[in-house]
Every structure is written in C-alpha cells, then in structure tokens.
C-alpha cells in the first residue's frame, strides 16, 4: 500500500514538473489574449455602441429621419449586421426569449408606465380599457378563427391545431408601445388621440401575454386531454393573472415610496430603490405566474407622484435620464435583433399564410375599432370622430412584444418557423409602410394636433374648477361618475396616502384643494380689510375731533430740495430727457430678460419631460416662448398723459420741439 502511494506521488511530481518546464519554455509574456474571458460582455457593449452610433447618424441625416421612424432605421441596421454575420462563423446569433423577457422588456414597460400622463389616462380609462381588453380578445379570436377555417381547406403548407393558431393570433394582436410612442410623438397628435393609442398599446401587451400563456398551456396539454374544468380555470386565470399583476404593482409602488421616504440621511440610496423595487415587482409577478407587464407598469404609474416629494430635484432628473437610457438601449437592441433575425433565424415562407394574416390584422382591427367607438360614443361627452377612428385603426403597429413572444414558442409546435416568418413580415409591414405613411395621412386628414403652448394659470385653475363643478353636478343628479371618483380620491390622497408615503406631507383634516383654499384665503382677506376699514374710519373721526380742538394749524415746511425739484419739473426738456432715460432702461432690461430666457429655454428644451404629453410639445414650446418674448419687446409701453406709447414712440417723441408742462403728480403717475 505504501509503495503504491509512493509511486502515485512520484507520478504527480513528475507530471507537475513537466508542466512547469513546458510553461517555462515560453518565458514571461507581456500581453495575453483573454478573449474567452470577456467576449460576452465585450460583444454586448459593442452592440450597444454600434446601435447608439447608428441612432446618432440617423439624427444627423435629417431628410432620412424625417420620413423613416427610428425603429425602421434600426431594423435596416440589423439587416446589414445579419448579412455580415452570415458571412462569418457567428451566423447562429439570435435573440433568446429568456433574455428578452427578463432583461430587455422590463425597462421598456417601466419607462412607459413611469412617463404615463396619469390624469389624461384616468379621464379616458373607459375607452383605454375597452380597446385593450375587449379589442384584444376580438382580434385574437377573429384572426385565429379565420386562419383556422382556411386551414381546413388545406391552403397552408404547415398544419397546426386550434390552440396553436390561437397562440399565434394572440401574439400577433400585441400592439407595440415602443413603435406607437416613436411614431405618434413625431407627428404631435392631440392628447385625446395619443392617450387612447398609447394606453391601449401598453395594457394590450399585458392582456396579450395572459392570452398567450393560457393558449400555450392548452396547446402543450393537448385538446384531447382538456376537461371542462380546465377551460373554466383558464378563463378565470385571465382575470386572476391581470388583477394579480396590478395588485403586485400597487404593493411595490407603496414599498418604493416608503423606502424613499426614509432615505433623507442617505440620499444616494433613493434611486437604487426606485429601480430595484419595480424590477422586483416584475420578477415577483413572473415567479408566481401573474402578469409581470401589468405589475411593473402599474408600479411605475403609481409611485411617480409620491417619490418626487421624497427625493431632490437633481435625483428626480437622474431617475428620468437613467430610465430613458435603459429603455432606449433595450428598444435599440430589440429592433436591431428584428433585422438580424430576418437573415439568421430558421424560416418557412408561406405566402398565403402571410398575406391572410396581414389582411385579417388590418380588417379585424378596423372593425373592432369602429364597433367599440360606436358603443363608447353613446356614453361619452368627448366623441370619437371618424378621423380619430381611422388613426386608431391605422396606428396598430406591431413590434418587439410580438417578436419576443413568437421566438419563445415551444419547439414542439411544428408551425413555429412559419409563425416566426409571418410575425417578422407583419412587423415590417406595420413599421415601414404604416409608420412611414401615417404622417402624410395625419396631415392630409387634418387631424387635430397638440397645442404647442403651456396652459396659462387661469386655464389651469379653471380646468380644476370645472372638475369640481362636474363633481357637484354629479352629486346633485344623484350619480357617481369619474369626476366624483377623482374628488374622493384626491381627498383621500391628501388625508391618508400622501402623509404616509411622502416625507413633508401632513395629515389634512379638511379638503385641501386649491380652489377651496383660495376661496378661504379670499374670504379671510376680505374680513381683514373690513376690520382695517372700520379701524380707519374710527381713527379719522378721532383726528377730526382733535383738529377741531387745535387752536392754530401747523404750517408745512418747504425744503430747498422741494424748490429745486419743482423748478426741474417745469422744464419740458427735462421731462423729455426723463422719458428717454426710462425708455432706454426699459429696452435694456427687456433685452437682458430675453437673452436670459433664451439661455433657460435652450438648457431646458432638450431635457426629459415628466410624461409623454409634455415631451410631444417640448420642442414647439420653445418657438412659442421666443414669439412671446419678441411680442413683449415690441409692445412694451409707457403711460404718458393718458396715452399708450411704445418705447420706440417715446424716443421719437422726445426729439420733438414740443415742451409740455407737467406737474409733480403727473410725473409720479408715470
């Protein structure tokens, strides 16, 4: 036994010595090639760098970027990259569905939820809910049923079952919020149309994923193995998954707000909670098989108004920029992978299936929008016009969500290559053809555009006033509409939610709305004025009594300065010189204010806005501000002897030989 152990140790020593000698032959190397150690991270970084440089190049090419959306340009870059990879040994590069749903999709949905204009969404919540839920159900079953009927006549080259085609019809019904935002922000449609298209695209994705998962489970089980209980459970899961995802989003929104509330001692940690907790909401929903898209979208929407009161302005801007950066990187990678997969993925081209899918997508979306708008118009004050219905039908762009779902179809489904090819063709059709032509159509149909100006203070106050007035009308009529719900929520928000979730908010024992507070303030000021008037009248009566008692009134003393000033005021030339001096000073001050406003506008114009509504009008507001400043400069006036005179008129007037006489009162009045 000892001899065997000795032989083993001897062999190990000899082998080690031989290896050391072999390594020693090469000697010391100054540089080492460690590609295997860093190649994955390096490829990802290079990918993002190429995509970012491509977007910069597109932005510099104004004629090209004016007509082609960014998404279509990135797909073109992906096509070029795919052709290059096909000529090399890296032709197997593809987008993994696991990476898509866990790393690329969450930043996009969080960005859409965080920058969602909540007030506009709630005012149109009925239409958004109808379009995203009922519209998605209609498109899924209509497209799937039509393709299934055609397959019975053996018109397609690959067979599929009922649930397999429903899996495909569910994913092809997903309207992409990325493509919708990119297109509709550029054409500056009105807020009513934008919020309906954007809201539908966001929540439509959550509904689509729920349907997709349900039909995929049915397809894997097999229709012959399904029982009525399975169908009932699947239908119930549609509501459980959606509402459960929303509940998780609410819980994590509260957790994020509370976490940021107590970070005043360590402010650097606040942005960490803002990004980690929503992502944990997404992962938690995935873990328990609930809607992760709805979870992170709801979390972003709800936490925004509370975390702004808990963090500094600099931290708020940092959060906005980092959110946008993550979303832009994810969108860029996804669209480039769309172009790449055209040449690198396994395809099965069936022209009849592709053509039928395109036609059914267009026809059934138009039918669904028309019918839903017809029903909604019977119960809405703000009606959907014919032009609005056309843009809603034409704006159903497909994109990243549909592609991510189709590549995650199980390999056991035989028709998967045909589904992938058809999905890519539908995405290309909607992004390129519809995305390019929607701008000319909007201009041709005279679709109402967003007003490129900020609301005045009076408009803001009266908009709030109208909301409360409508709430009062609903209360008098004995009805409970969304105006009453808004009032009740704002009251509950001020009394309970804000004091709990925000740092410097105190519990309010009354309805602390701006209108009521303004009314109470005015009433209090009127009472104070009446008290002062009463006190003044009493003082005047006392002074009158005292003056009657006086034997000799006091004489007013005239100082030498008063005499000198009176002589100066009697000269007309001096008055004209004063006008000239005031005019020059005013013009100089206006120019300084204009230059300062230009600097502020240039600094703030490219800044990220709080939501997508503000982003649509940010660039146009700059021109409006410049026009207002110019108008103020040209219309600046003095009041002289009851006449309006511009500063230019004053300069010309001061050069005349007319020398009017002015009293001290008139100069002070000026």
UniProtKB/Swiss-Prot annotation:
Location of region: Disordered: 648-670
Gene Ontology CC entries for this record: endomembrane system; plasma membrane
Bilayer-spanning residue ranges: 41-61, 73-93, 97-117, 129-149, 164-184, 192-212, 235-255, 268-288, 325-345, 351-371, 390-410, 418-438
Keyword line: Antiport, Glycoprotein, Ion transport, Membrane, Phosphoprotein, Sodium, Sodium transport, Transmembrane, Transmembrane helix, Transport
Residues annotated as glycosylated: 310
Gene Ontology BP term (one): potassium ion transmembrane transport
Summary of the tissues where the protein is detected: Expressed in hypodermal cells of the main body syncytium, ut1 cells of the vulva and the spermathecal junction cell.
One Pfam family from the record: Na_H_Exchanger
Coiled coil ranges: none
MF term (GO), any: potassium:proton antiporter activity
Membrane topology: Multi-pass membrane protein
Record PTM: Phosphorylated.
Compartments where located: Endomembrane system
Function of the molecule: Plays a role in epithelial membrane transport processes.
Similarity comment: family membership: Belongs to the monovalent cation:proton antiporter 1 (CPA1) transporter (TC 2.A.36) family.
Name of protein: Probable Na(+)/H(+) antiporter nhx-3
